[in-house]
Amino acid sequence: MKKIKIYADGADINEMVKMDNENFVTGFTTNPTLMSRLGITDYLGFAKEVLSKIKNKSISFEVFSDDIDDMYRQALILRDLGDNVWVKIPVTNTKSEPTYDLIHKLSTEGVKVNATALFTHEHIEKVFDALNPNINSIISIFAGRIANVGLDPEPTMKFAAELTKEHPLVETLWASTREIFNIVEAARTN
């Protein structure tokens, strides 16, 4: 069984620094919505400040553009901020345009991608096909939101876990966690 890793999700730098001191926290994720809620308007400045304080754990920063070409440009800027940066790319934009080609391009260029907002087996399969198997990557499956609509997220997470056996550099992230029990469920999916 793989070891469970805990990622703290947020945009409050002081809280992130506190969590950085906790042994159980493996890394961090944030996104434009969380930052907007805290009134953060200088995304690049925020990212640089976080990275100046958190140096030894992975941090996933999400692109904020809805245009796929601009997502690519932003991803390269984020990638260049540090070796511990993963670039979050949503599996589709708000126009429901898939980003699999973008994920493939970035991954092929050596960008550590955190493909996010995955809900379905199709999303998972297409992202796995897009990722460079020689580059560390994360797929963030919104298991909590799957559960919110009354579905059991475990089969979806188990499906992804099976695929990681063939892609050992790809990790699955049980995203949108709602309950402590989700840790038990995640452990059961291996």
Regions inferred by a protein language model and the residue ranges of each:
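Active-site beta->alpha loop and helix N-cap motifs at the rims of alpha/beta catalytic domains
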Residues: 2-17, 21-25, 29-109, 143-146
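Catalytic alpha/beta core domains of metabolic enzymes, predominantly
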Residues: 97, 101, 111-190
